Amino acid sequence: MNIRNTLVLLVSTVLVLMSCSIGCYAGSPNCVGAPSGQVYIFSSWDFQGDRYVYNISQGQTTLPDSFIHNVQSFTSGSEICFASCNPLETYQISAGQSHRNYAALENFGQRMNLIIPGNCSNLVCPSN
């Protein structure tokens, strides 16, 4: 193989490899997007750290201890409701919605402890 053919092969290989990696980078919600019927909740910003997978078939669910008042980022594949019952506070989340830093400043990720499928009107707060 001559030098010209070697260079053409090398450049072609590099271009193919680059085209495979364009459009999706670590932490992109497009790369970690939850499929329909699921929500991915992360313990760190930018869709990093531990991940909790919620399926809408679970119904109203209290988050695992490590995620209560600690939802740092999320991506939703379904319409769901994030909630806190004491004091009562709810946020409706649409399918396809995501947030890279949900617990920053006054964001609700620092206060939520429940997740509900569908509309927030379905919330039933547990009695204390």
Swiss-Prot record:
The keyword Membrane does not apply. This is Spore germination protein 1/2/3-related protein. Residues 1-26 form the signal peptide. Coiled coil: none annotated. It comes from the Eukaryota. The keyword Signal applies. Belongs to the Dictyostelium gerABC family. GO terms for cellular component: extracellular region. It is found in: Secreted. Glycans are attached at residues 55, 119. Keywords: Glycoprotein, Secreted, Signal.
